[in-house]
Protein backbone atom coordinates (compact mmCIF):
# COMPACT_ATOMS: atom_id res chain seq x y z
CA UNK A 1 0.00 0.00 0.00
CA UNK A 2 1.07 3.59 -0.56
CA UNK A 3 2.34 5.63 2.39
CA UNK A 4 1.48 9.21 3.31
CA UNK A 5 4.42 10.66 1.35
CA UNK A 6 3.44 8.57 -1.66
CA UNK A 7 -0.11 9.93 -1.59
CA UNK A 8 1.28 13.46 -1.31
CA UNK A 9 3.43 12.98 -4.43
CA UNK A 10 0.55 11.48 -6.42
CA UNK A 11 -1.90 14.21 -5.39
CA UNK A 12 0.67 16.92 -6.22
CA UNK A 13 1.14 15.37 -9.65
CA UNK A 14 -2.60 15.13 -10.36
CA UNK A 15 -3.25 18.72 -9.29
CA UNK A 16 -0.22 20.00 -11.21
CA UNK A 17 -1.11 18.23 -14.44
CA UNK A 18 -4.72 19.41 -14.18
CA UNK A 19 -3.64 23.03 -13.70
CA UNK A 20 -1.17 22.79 -16.59
CA UNK A 21 -3.77 21.29 -18.91
CA UNK A 22 -6.41 23.88 -18.05
CA UNK A 23 -3.84 26.67 -18.47
CA UNK A 24 -3.35 25.72 -22.11
CA UNK A 25 -7.13 25.67 -22.59
CA UNK A 26 -6.86 29.49 -22.78
CA UNK A 27 -5.32 29.16 -26.23
CA UNK A 28 -8.20 27.14 -27.72
CA UNK A 29 -10.45 29.55 -29.63
CA UNK A 30 -11.33 27.51 -32.72
CA UNK A 31 -11.69 23.96 -34.01
CA UNK A 32 -8.27 24.32 -35.65
CA UNK A 33 -6.75 25.15 -32.26
CA UNK A 34 -8.52 22.17 -30.65
CA UNK A 35 -7.47 19.63 -33.30
CA UNK A 36 -4.11 20.92 -34.64
CA UNK A 37 -2.98 23.66 -32.20
CA UNK A 38 -3.00 26.14 -35.07
CA UNK A 39 0.15 24.39 -36.40
CA UNK A 40 2.31 25.99 -33.72
CA UNK A 41 4.04 23.13 -31.88
CA UNK A 42 7.86 22.73 -31.72
CA UNK A 43 9.48 19.43 -32.70
CA UNK A 44 10.84 18.57 -29.23
CA UNK A 45 7.41 18.81 -27.59
CA UNK A 46 5.80 16.70 -30.31
CA UNK A 47 8.61 14.13 -30.20
CA UNK A 48 8.20 13.69 -26.46
CA UNK A 49 4.42 13.58 -26.85
CA UNK A 50 4.68 10.82 -29.48
CA UNK A 51 6.63 8.64 -27.04
CA UNK A 52 4.33 9.48 -24.13
CA UNK A 53 1.33 8.59 -26.30
CA UNK A 54 2.80 5.35 -27.61
CA UNK A 55 4.07 4.11 -24.23
CA UNK A 56 1.06 3.84 -22.01
CA UNK A 57 0.24 2.34 -18.65
CA UNK A 58 -0.60 -0.78 -20.62
CA UNK A 59 3.09 -1.06 -21.58
CA UNK A 60 4.30 -0.82 -17.99
CA UNK A 61 1.87 -3.54 -16.97
CA UNK A 62 1.38 -5.46 -20.23
CA UNK A 63 4.91 -5.52 -21.67
CA UNK A 64 6.35 -6.42 -18.28
CA UNK A 65 3.76 -9.19 -18.16
CA UNK A 66 4.82 -10.52 -21.57
CA UNK A 67 8.53 -10.41 -20.68
CA UNK A 68 7.69 -12.23 -17.43
CA UNK A 69 6.10 -15.01 -19.49
CA UNK A 70 8.26 -15.06 -22.64
CA UNK A 71 11.38 -12.95 -22.06
CA UNK A 72 13.14 -10.31 -24.14
CA UNK A 73 11.44 -11.19 -27.44
CA UNK A 74 8.74 -8.62 -26.69
CA UNK A 75 11.44 -5.93 -26.94
CA UNK A 76 11.53 -6.48 -30.70
CA UNK A 77 8.32 -4.44 -30.96
CA UNK A 78 10.34 -1.28 -30.28
CA UNK A 79 13.88 -2.12 -31.43
CA UNK A 80 12.99 -4.03 -34.62
CA UNK A 81 9.53 -2.59 -35.24
CA UNK A 82 8.85 0.96 -34.12
CA UNK A 83 12.25 2.57 -34.67
CA UNK A 84 12.68 1.63 -38.37
CA UNK A 85 9.04 2.58 -38.99
CA UNK A 86 9.56 5.99 -37.38
CA UNK A 87 12.56 6.69 -39.62
CA UNK A 88 10.50 5.75 -42.68
CA UNK A 89 7.66 7.98 -41.50
CA UNK A 90 10.00 10.91 -40.81
CA UNK A 91 11.63 11.02 -44.23
CA UNK A 92 8.79 9.97 -46.56
CA UNK A 93 5.26 10.00 -45.18
CA UNK A 94 5.08 12.78 -42.56
CA UNK A 95 6.44 15.56 -44.86
CA UNK A 96 3.96 14.48 -47.52
CA UNK A 97 1.01 14.58 -45.13
CA UNK A 98 2.07 17.93 -43.64
CA UNK A 99 2.32 19.59 -47.06
CA UNK A 100 -1.13 18.26 -47.95
CA UNK A 101 -2.65 20.18 -45.03
CA UNK A 102 -4.41 17.13 -43.63
CA UNK A 103 -6.27 16.80 -40.34
CA UNK A 104 -6.50 12.99 -40.51
CA UNK A 105 -5.12 10.04 -42.49
CA UNK A 106 -8.65 8.94 -43.54
CA UNK A 107 -9.03 12.44 -45.01
CA UNK A 108 -6.22 11.58 -47.44
CA UNK A 109 -7.86 8.24 -48.25
CA UNK A 110 -11.08 10.11 -49.03
CA UNK A 111 -9.29 12.41 -51.46
CA UNK A 112 -7.38 9.54 -53.07
CA UNK A 113 -10.22 7.00 -53.29
CA UNK A 114 -13.71 8.10 -52.17
CA UNK A 115 -15.78 8.97 -49.13
CA UNK A 116 -16.66 5.32 -48.47
CA UNK A 117 -13.01 4.39 -48.00
CA UNK A 118 -12.57 7.43 -45.78
CA UNK A 119 -15.55 6.50 -43.62
CA UNK A 120 -14.57 2.84 -43.22
CA UNK A 121 -10.96 3.71 -42.33
CA UNK A 122 -12.05 6.37 -39.87
CA UNK A 123 -14.66 4.17 -38.19
CA UNK A 124 -12.19 1.29 -37.77
CA UNK A 125 -9.74 3.60 -35.97
CA UNK A 126 -12.55 5.03 -33.84
CA UNK A 127 -13.64 1.52 -32.81
CA UNK A 128 -10.03 0.57 -32.01
CA UNK A 129 -9.44 3.70 -29.94
CA UNK A 130 -12.65 3.04 -28.01
CA UNK A 131 -11.54 -0.52 -27.20
CA UNK A 132 -7.98 0.65 -26.49
CA UNK A 133 -9.35 3.12 -23.99
CA UNK A 134 -11.07 0.26 -22.18
CA UNK A 135 -7.77 -1.66 -21.98
CA UNK A 136 -6.01 1.38 -20.53
CA UNK A 137 -8.68 1.86 -17.91
CA UNK A 138 -8.39 -1.80 -16.96
CA UNK A 139 -4.61 -1.37 -16.63
CA UNK A 140 -5.42 1.33 -14.09
CA UNK A 141 -7.47 -1.13 -12.08
CA UNK A 142 -4.70 -3.77 -12.23
CA UNK A 143 -2.20 -1.27 -10.79
CA UNK A 144 -4.45 0.54 -8.31
CA UNK A 145 -5.96 -2.49 -6.57
CA UNK A 146 -2.77 -3.95 -5.00
CA UNK A 147 -1.19 -0.56 -4.25
CA UNK A 148 -4.15 1.49 -3.08
CA UNK A 149 -6.83 -1.07 -2.33
CA UNK A 150 -9.29 0.68 -4.65
CA UNK A 151 -12.02 -1.28 -6.37
CA UNK A 152 -11.62 -1.45 -10.18
CA UNK A 153 -14.63 0.73 -10.99
CA UNK A 154 -13.56 3.46 -8.57
CA UNK A 155 -10.03 3.57 -10.05
CA UNK A 156 -11.39 3.73 -13.59
CA UNK A 157 -13.91 6.50 -12.92
CA UNK A 158 -11.41 8.71 -11.04
CA UNK A 159 -8.88 8.40 -13.88
CA UNK A 160 -11.53 9.12 -16.50
CA UNK A 161 -12.69 12.28 -14.73
CA UNK A 162 -9.20 13.76 -14.28
CA UNK A 163 -7.90 13.18 -17.80
CA UNK A 164 -11.25 13.90 -19.45
CA UNK A 165 -11.52 17.35 -17.88
CA UNK A 166 -8.34 18.90 -19.28
CA UNK A 167 -8.68 17.12 -22.65
CA UNK A 168 -12.25 18.42 -23.03
CA UNK A 169 -11.22 22.03 -22.52
CA UNK A 170 -7.60 22.12 -23.68
CA UNK A 171 -7.57 20.16 -26.95
CA UNK A 172 -4.34 19.03 -28.57
CA UNK A 173 -2.22 21.84 -27.10
CA UNK A 174 -3.05 20.73 -23.55
CA UNK A 175 -2.51 17.11 -24.55
CA UNK A 176 0.96 17.69 -26.01
CA UNK A 177 2.27 20.05 -23.33
CA UNK A 178 1.10 17.82 -20.48
CA UNK A 179 2.64 14.87 -22.35
CA UNK A 180 6.06 16.56 -22.11
CA UNK A 181 5.85 16.58 -18.31
CA UNK A 182 4.37 13.11 -18.26
CA UNK A 183 7.13 11.60 -20.41
CA UNK A 184 9.78 12.94 -18.03
CA UNK A 185 7.92 11.46 -15.04
CA UNK A 186 7.46 8.21 -16.91
CA UNK A 187 11.20 7.87 -17.54
CA UNK A 188 12.13 8.81 -13.96
CA UNK A 189 9.62 6.39 -12.44
CA UNK A 190 10.57 3.56 -14.78
CA UNK A 191 14.26 4.10 -14.09
CA UNK A 192 13.61 3.92 -10.34
CA UNK A 193 12.02 0.47 -10.67
CA UNK A 194 14.83 -0.72 -12.94
CA UNK A 195 17.69 0.43 -10.68
CA UNK A 196 16.13 -0.83 -7.44
CA UNK A 197 15.06 -4.09 -9.07
CA UNK A 198 18.52 -4.81 -10.48
CA UNK A 199 20.06 -4.04 -7.09
CA UNK A 200 17.84 -6.64 -5.40
CA UNK A 201 18.51 -9.15 -8.18
CA UNK A 202 22.29 -8.83 -7.78
CA UNK A 203 22.94 -6.75 -10.89
CA UNK A 204 22.69 -7.90 -14.48
CA UNK A 205 24.92 -10.90 -13.85
CA UNK A 206 22.87 -11.99 -10.87
CA UNK A 207 19.66 -11.58 -12.86
CA UNK A 208 20.84 -13.74 -15.76
CA UNK A 209 22.24 -16.39 -13.41
CA UNK A 210 19.00 -16.64 -11.43
CA UNK A 211 16.77 -16.95 -14.50
CA UNK A 212 18.93 -19.40 -16.46
CA UNK A 213 19.19 -21.58 -13.34
CA UNK A 214 15.40 -21.90 -13.23
CA UNK A 215 15.31 -24.59 -15.90
CA UNK A 216 14.71 -25.20 -19.58
CA UNK A 217 11.45 -23.23 -19.62
CA UNK A 218 13.46 -20.02 -19.17
CA UNK A 219 16.35 -20.67 -21.57
CA UNK A 220 14.92 -18.32 -24.22
CA UNK A 221 14.18 -15.45 -21.86
CA UNK A 222 17.29 -13.55 -22.97
CA UNK A 223 16.80 -14.06 -26.71
CA UNK A 224 15.42 -11.22 -28.82
CA UNK A 225 14.76 -13.49 -31.83
CA UNK A 226 12.84 -16.74 -31.31
CA UNK A 227 12.55 -19.67 -33.76
CA UNK A 228 9.64 -19.95 -36.18
CA UNK A 229 8.17 -22.94 -34.34
CA UNK A 230 8.02 -21.22 -30.93
CA UNK A 231 4.75 -21.46 -29.03
CA UNK A 232 5.06 -17.83 -27.92
CA UNK A 233 3.37 -14.98 -29.86
CA UNK A 234 6.81 -13.82 -31.14
CA UNK A 235 8.23 -16.22 -33.81
CA UNK A 236 10.85 -14.59 -36.05
CA UNK A 237 8.62 -15.05 -39.08
CA UNK A 238 5.84 -13.11 -37.40
CA UNK A 239 8.29 -10.44 -36.23
CA UNK A 240 9.67 -9.97 -39.76
CA UNK A 241 6.47 -10.05 -41.81
CA UNK A 242 3.73 -9.14 -39.37
CA UNK A 243 5.59 -6.65 -37.17
CA UNK A 244 8.45 -5.05 -39.12
CA UNK A 245 6.74 -4.89 -42.52
CA UNK A 246 3.13 -4.26 -41.49
CA UNK A 247 2.11 -3.52 -37.89
CA UNK A 248 4.86 -1.08 -36.97
CA UNK A 249 4.63 0.86 -40.23
CA UNK A 250 0.85 0.91 -40.07
CA UNK A 251 0.98 2.16 -36.48
CA UNK A 252 3.59 4.89 -36.93
CA UNK A 253 2.41 6.04 -40.37
CA UNK A 254 -1.35 5.55 -40.17
CA UNK A 255 -2.19 6.02 -36.48
CA UNK A 256 -4.12 9.25 -36.00
CA UNK A 257 -2.88 9.68 -32.43
CA UNK A 258 0.74 9.67 -33.68
CA UNK A 259 0.44 11.48 -37.01
CA UNK A 260 -1.86 14.23 -35.72
CA UNK A 261 0.94 15.56 -33.53
CA UNK A 262 3.35 15.83 -36.45
CA UNK A 263 0.70 17.64 -38.50
CA UNK A 264 0.42 20.24 -35.72
CA UNK A 265 4.09 21.31 -35.94
CA UNK A 266 5.35 24.67 -37.20
CA UNK A 267 6.91 23.45 -40.45
CA UNK A 268 7.91 20.41 -42.48
CA UNK A 269 11.31 20.49 -40.79
CA UNK A 270 9.69 20.39 -37.35
CA UNK A 271 7.39 17.58 -38.52
CA UNK A 272 10.38 15.44 -39.59
CA UNK A 273 12.41 16.33 -36.52
CA UNK A 274 9.54 15.46 -34.18
CA UNK A 275 9.41 11.88 -35.44
CA UNK A 276 13.21 11.54 -35.28
CA UNK A 277 13.18 12.93 -31.73
CA UNK A 278 10.56 10.35 -30.81
CA UNK A 279 12.63 7.56 -32.39
CA UNK A 280 15.62 8.55 -30.23
CA UNK A 281 13.62 8.26 -27.00
CA UNK A 282 12.02 5.00 -28.17
CA UNK A 283 15.44 3.31 -28.01
CA UNK A 284 15.23 3.35 -24.22
CA UNK A 285 11.61 2.26 -23.81
CA UNK A 286 12.21 -1.55 -23.74
CA UNK A 287 14.73 -1.03 -20.95
CA UNK A 288 12.07 0.67 -18.83
CA UNK A 289 9.06 -1.55 -19.57
CA UNK A 290 10.54 -4.95 -20.49
CA UNK A 291 13.38 -5.48 -18.00
CA UNK A 292 11.11 -5.14 -14.93
CA UNK A 293 9.33 -8.28 -16.12
CA UNK A 294 12.64 -10.16 -16.16
CA UNK A 295 13.49 -8.85 -12.70
CA UNK A 296 10.13 -10.11 -11.46
CA UNK A 297 10.92 -13.59 -12.83
CA UNK A 298 14.04 -13.70 -10.65
CA UNK A 299 12.52 -12.12 -7.56
CA UNK A 300 8.92 -13.35 -7.65
CA UNK A 301 8.68 -16.56 -9.69
CA UNK A 302 5.39 -18.38 -9.94
CA UNK A 303 2.99 -15.46 -10.37
CA UNK A 304 -0.26 -16.78 -11.83
CA UNK A 305 -0.86 -13.62 -13.87
CA UNK A 306 2.13 -12.10 -15.68
CA UNK A 307 0.43 -8.70 -15.64
CA UNK A 308 0.96 -8.65 -11.86
CA UNK A 309 4.76 -8.61 -12.33
CA UNK A 310 5.15 -4.82 -12.43
CA UNK A 311 2.71 -4.03 -9.57
CA UNK A 312 4.39 -6.74 -7.48
CA UNK A 313 7.83 -5.14 -7.97
CA UNK A 314 6.53 -1.72 -7.03
CA UNK A 315 4.70 -3.00 -3.96
CA UNK A 316 7.54 -5.13 -2.57
CA UNK A 317 10.80 -3.47 -3.63
CA UNK A 318 10.33 0.30 -3.76
CA UNK A 319 10.58 2.33 -0.52
CA UNK A 320 8.08 5.08 0.39
CA UNK A 321 8.64 8.17 -1.73
CA UNK A 322 10.03 6.23 -4.68
CA UNK A 323 6.80 4.25 -4.74
CA UNK A 324 4.83 7.48 -5.02
CA UNK A 325 7.18 8.77 -7.72
CA UNK A 326 6.75 5.57 -9.71
CA UNK A 327 3.00 5.69 -9.25
CA UNK A 328 2.99 9.25 -10.57
CA UNK A 329 5.04 8.02 -13.54
CA UNK A 330 2.53 5.24 -14.11
CA UNK A 331 -0.33 7.74 -14.04
CA UNK A 332 1.64 9.92 -16.45
CA UNK A 333 1.96 7.04 -18.90
CA UNK A 334 -1.72 6.27 -18.53
CA UNK A 335 -3.00 9.82 -18.89
CA UNK A 336 -0.71 10.75 -21.78
CA UNK A 337 -2.18 7.95 -23.88
CA UNK A 338 -5.78 8.44 -22.81
CA UNK A 339 -5.76 12.17 -23.57
CA UNK A 340 -4.23 11.47 -26.99
CA UNK A 341 -6.86 8.85 -27.80
CA UNK A 342 -9.66 11.18 -26.75
CA UNK A 343 -8.44 14.09 -28.86
CA UNK A 344 -7.58 11.96 -31.90
CA UNK A 345 -10.92 10.15 -31.87
CA UNK A 346 -12.74 13.46 -31.56
CA UNK A 347 -10.80 14.65 -34.63
CA UNK A 348 -11.66 11.52 -36.63
CA UNK A 349 -15.34 11.69 -35.73
CA UNK A 350 -15.70 15.43 -36.32
CA UNK A 351 -13.66 15.76 -39.53
CA UNK A 352 -14.17 12.41 -41.26
CA UNK A 353 -17.70 11.48 -40.25
CA UNK A 354 -19.75 14.36 -38.83
CA UNK A 355 -18.51 17.22 -41.02
CA UNK A 356 -18.43 15.03 -44.12
CA UNK A 357 -21.73 13.17 -43.81
CA UNK A 358 -23.90 14.90 -41.19
CA UNK A 359 -23.41 18.68 -41.29
CA UNK A 360 -21.02 20.04 -43.90
CA UNK A 361 -21.22 23.81 -43.56
CA UNK A 362 -21.65 24.51 -39.86
CA UNK A 363 -19.73 27.16 -37.95
CA UNK A 364 -16.26 26.60 -36.54
CA UNK A 365 -17.71 26.90 -33.05
CA UNK A 366 -20.18 24.11 -33.83
CA UNK A 367 -17.41 21.69 -34.86
CA UNK A 368 -15.46 22.55 -31.71
CA UNK A 369 -18.53 21.61 -29.66
CA UNK A 370 -18.96 18.35 -31.62
CA UNK A 371 -15.33 17.42 -30.90
CA UNK A 372 -15.81 18.08 -27.19
CA UNK A 373 -19.02 16.04 -27.05
CA UNK A 374 -17.26 13.17 -28.86
CA UNK A 375 -14.59 13.29 -26.15
CA UNK A 376 -17.19 12.75 -23.42
CA UNK A 377 -19.00 9.96 -25.29
CA UNK A 378 -15.76 8.06 -25.92
CA UNK A 379 -14.75 8.43 -22.29
CA UNK A 380 -18.01 6.85 -21.15
CA UNK A 381 -17.70 4.04 -23.72
CA UNK A 382 -14.15 3.26 -22.56
CA UNK A 383 -15.26 3.02 -18.94
CA UNK A 384 -18.12 0.65 -19.84
CA UNK A 385 -16.02 -1.66 -22.04
CA UNK A 386 -12.95 -1.85 -19.79
CA UNK A 387 -13.82 -5.28 -18.26
CA UNK A 388 -13.54 -6.88 -21.74
CA UNK A 389 -9.75 -6.70 -21.38
CA UNK A 390 -9.83 -9.34 -18.68
CA UNK A 391 -10.89 -11.93 -21.28
CA UNK A 392 -7.45 -11.91 -22.97
CA UNK A 393 -4.16 -13.55 -21.94
CA UNK A 394 -2.67 -10.25 -20.86
CA UNK A 395 -3.32 -6.59 -21.62
CA UNK A 396 -0.62 -6.49 -24.29
CA UNK A 397 -2.26 -9.35 -26.19
CA UNK A 398 -5.59 -7.51 -26.04
CA UNK A 399 -4.17 -4.36 -27.68
CA UNK A 400 -2.24 -6.23 -30.39
CA UNK A 401 -5.27 -8.38 -31.19
CA UNK A 402 -7.49 -5.33 -31.65
CA UNK A 403 -4.87 -3.70 -33.88
CA UNK A 404 -4.38 -6.77 -36.06
CA UNK A 405 -8.02 -6.73 -37.19
CA UNK A 406 -7.56 -3.68 -39.41
CA UNK A 407 -4.00 -2.33 -39.48
CA UNK A 408 -2.87 -4.52 -42.38
CA UNK A 409 -5.81 -3.64 -44.67
CA UNK A 410 -5.69 0.09 -43.87
CA UNK A 411 -1.94 0.22 -44.46
CA UNK A 412 -2.26 -1.64 -47.78
CA UNK A 413 -4.83 0.90 -49.01
CA UNK A 414 -2.65 3.82 -47.89
CA UNK A 415 0.50 2.38 -49.46
CA UNK A 416 -1.06 1.57 -52.83
CA UNK A 417 -2.89 4.88 -52.87
CA UNK A 418 0.30 6.86 -52.40
CA UNK A 419 2.62 4.91 -54.68
CA UNK A 420 0.47 3.18 -57.34
CA UNK A 421 -1.47 5.57 -59.62
CA UNK A 422 -3.52 2.70 -61.04
CA UNK A 423 -5.33 2.08 -57.72
CA UNK A 424 -9.01 2.99 -58.14
CA UNK A 425 -11.74 4.00 -55.74
CA UNK A 426 -13.41 0.59 -55.93
CA UNK A 427 -10.08 -1.17 -55.58
CA UNK A 428 -9.47 0.75 -52.36
CA UNK A 429 -12.90 -0.05 -50.95
CA UNK A 430 -12.81 -3.76 -51.84
CA UNK A 431 -9.24 -4.08 -50.54
CA UNK A 432 -10.06 -2.38 -47.25
CA UNK A 433 -13.30 -4.23 -46.50
CA UNK A 434 -11.98 -7.54 -47.85
CA UNK A 435 -8.82 -7.28 -45.77
CA UNK A 436 -10.77 -6.63 -42.57
CA UNK A 437 -13.06 -9.59 -43.34
CA UNK A 438 -9.93 -11.71 -43.88
CA UNK A 439 -8.72 -10.76 -40.39
CA UNK A 440 -12.03 -11.81 -38.89
CA UNK A 441 -11.95 -15.17 -40.71
CA UNK A 442 -8.36 -15.82 -39.63
CA UNK A 443 -9.38 -15.37 -36.00
CA UNK A 444 -12.46 -17.57 -36.40
CA UNK A 445 -10.30 -20.43 -37.72
CA UNK A 446 -7.08 -19.60 -35.86
CA UNK A 447 -6.93 -22.95 -34.03
CA UNK A 448 -6.81 -24.75 -37.40
CA UNK A 449 -4.47 -22.30 -39.15
CA UNK A 450 -1.81 -21.37 -36.57
CA UNK A 451 0.27 -23.23 -34.02
CA UNK A 452 0.45 -20.31 -31.56
CA UNK A 453 -2.36 -19.17 -29.28
CA UNK A 454 -2.17 -15.45 -30.09
CA UNK A 455 -1.43 -15.13 -33.84
CA UNK A 456 -1.88 -11.36 -34.13
CA UNK A 457 1.39 -10.93 -36.07
CA UNK A 458 0.38 -13.50 -38.67
CA UNK A 459 -3.14 -12.06 -38.92
CA UNK A 460 -1.68 -8.61 -39.61
CA UNK A 461 0.53 -9.95 -42.39
CA UNK A 462 -2.06 -12.07 -44.18
CA UNK A 463 -4.79 -9.42 -43.93
CA UNK A 464 -2.31 -6.95 -45.46
CA UNK A 465 -1.58 -9.37 -48.30
CA UNK A 466 -5.30 -10.00 -48.82
CA UNK A 467 -6.14 -6.29 -48.78
CA UNK A 468 -3.36 -5.41 -51.22
CA UNK A 469 -4.21 -8.30 -53.56
CA UNK A 470 -7.91 -7.43 -53.65
CA UNK A 471 -7.07 -3.77 -54.23
CA UNK A 472 -4.79 -4.58 -57.17
CA UNK A 473 -7.17 -7.13 -58.72
CA UNK A 474 -10.20 -4.84 -58.47
CA UNK A 475 -8.29 -1.79 -59.69
CA UNK A 476 -7.12 -3.61 -62.81
CA UNK A 477 -10.71 -4.34 -63.88
CA UNK A 478 -12.24 -0.96 -62.97
CA UNK A 479 -11.85 2.46 -64.55
CA UNK A 480 -8.71 4.28 -63.49
CA UNK A 481 -8.72 7.86 -62.25
CA UNK A 482 -7.75 10.56 -64.76
CA UNK A 483 -4.23 11.92 -64.32
CA UNK A 484 -5.38 15.37 -63.29
CA UNK A 485 -7.46 13.95 -60.41
CA UNK A 486 -4.35 12.31 -58.95
CA UNK A 487 -2.35 15.55 -58.88
CA UNK A 488 -1.10 16.05 -55.33
CA UNK A 489 -2.37 12.64 -54.22
CA UNK A 490 0.19 10.19 -55.62
CA UNK A 491 3.78 10.29 -54.45
CA UNK A 492 6.05 10.37 -57.48
CA UNK A 493 9.73 10.59 -58.11
CA UNK A 494 10.79 13.82 -59.85
CA UNK A 495 11.74 11.95 -63.05
CA UNK A 496 8.16 10.65 -63.35
CA UNK A 497 6.45 14.04 -63.33
CA UNK A 498 6.76 14.74 -67.08
CA UNK A 499 5.40 18.24 -66.78
CA UNK A 500 2.54 17.47 -64.39
CA UNK A 501 2.29 20.47 -62.08
CA UNK A 502 1.57 20.68 -58.36
CA UNK A 503 2.44 17.07 -57.61
CA UNK A 504 4.33 16.54 -54.34
CA UNK A 505 7.45 14.42 -54.62
CA UNK A 506 8.89 11.91 -52.17
Task: Name these PLM-found stretches.
Residues 1-506:
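Membrane-embedded helix-loop-helix hairpins and adjacent transmembrane boundary segments
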